[in-house]
């Protein structure tokens, strides 16, 4: 029988079960060991029978139905992925699509006609980056705008700008990034953003400004290579062609700018015009926007008018103003860019930050949990015992610039032909796993802690990497023994029904975990390490080191270091095992059950190796239970009645786990059910409410939500490479729109 992780036993024992729901249960596939004499390394790409993109049934789905999940697992070969980087002094040669290339800092270069289009990118060997020499940066609080508290609303003016920051240790070059900051204070621009502190039932109004312009007011090019063959914002298409998948007569080079943005408050209970809808983007107010370019997305004007009608404020060009009612449970939220077809690149460039909602009946009284957290106006040197931790993976070039693939060849070695000769996009990679771990904008930082309790708010901000976090006394020993447990008290939707003791945290992309870590009694001078036992590849499930190779212990298997210092403050917080968490009001019964599908489409071209993935898709199921794959532009199929409570069944026909995020709602995880098995209750850390859930391969994941804001929203996979290439769908609450786009 397979082994499954049991979170109920503090000694980290394992329960034997055929149908256990944990992500540490049986793996959907067996992998060959990674061979990485020097990174980067390309393992064998997944090869499957050719399937047509328009076909509603993928080969993986057919195999699961015909053979059963376990047999399909054995027969479906895993694709390979590449961990970016190269040995010190070496160069990584990457091809440019159609002879046009994007240089590391976003400038364009076009070799002569007929040129191969390859150029050297010197990448930074992650093993040469010193670890634990830089102190962890604890994000300060974002300052409010002047006169911000008029009418009982906290107001902010926050822009996205380009700047240089020391992400790598000081002995190495700085990195050009994008990030949020208060337009009234240049010192607040940072990666990740300063934190927005909000109070339950007190509105927050933010004017989000696209300030990606230079000192002369000209638009800045993108830092990374943008693939214009996806279904994306497409400003060059003009108003008629925006938010579309363009057609080409020859393989295009990368789009470099101007760059559209739109900010989404992830986990917010938002109205449609303030949700950061992916087609409500806007360009900077630059003085050199090319003639004929669309300057806003398809929904921008409609939402601008709606916001004006509701709040008496019309958005200025290059901006959007959103208002958040904060009428939800105290919780850990975050904000990030959400532009159609560009999310993976815009967020990788830096724009993201925490939004912490406090107060109300669903919070704990002051002093019950470790504190303080950062507050506006804190004196320098203030010690914090509540700390948000944004964990991300990044790769770098030797000049300190960000590395992200500029060609599809990076993923699986397929060097073309690309669109339009085949259906393979020239730049987009199905997933990307970087080679360096970054916490709060610093590579492998260290934090001195007192021997007392700390409240840590974890966010998995990676593009594609699932994290399995553990606190160990060795940075490299695998398997690692837990040295200090986590007490998880909350997730995306606020506090759990009761604290849960865990030896490790499984966090999918965009998931959050609110935990208490108790360093009480640990001797001064002790060094402890936050390590990652997730994989350097797509996650399915299974025991680390058994079902899949753990992350490289020398690089991506290490996250940060804790050094226990002297006790200098009194800890009056309640021990986690004695905490009584706020009561949770469960949702009522559902009136509708929707059957939804998750699939992967492979290339249909005879010029492309069989099994080459070209899209990930959401959709529905037909009467026989077969997936009906739908693209972003297909008609809306999810249309809950206003104030209806519905159950959504996520049928995963792929061999990967997908973190599914539904905008506007906080949902309950009802259960999971293998395709040929019985329902399994949710994990203890998934109780209460969530906004992102792991849909495991070969299973039905059921969630239940109440849809109480009318309008247009989206649901999608939060592996952002998937999201950017069709694994996102619009949904409509409260009937049809007066007009569609």
Model-predicted segments: where are they?
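Active/binding-pocket-proximal capping segment
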Residues: 473-493, 653-687, 720-723, 732-737
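N-terminal, post-signal-peptide metal-ligating segments of extracellular/periplasmic oxidoreductases
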Residues: 59-60, 64-73, 78, 83-91, ...
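Asparagine-centered strand-capping/turn motif at beta-strand->loop junctions
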Residues: 208-212, 460-462, 650-654
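C-terminal substrate/ligand-recognition segments
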Residues: 595-669, 691-719
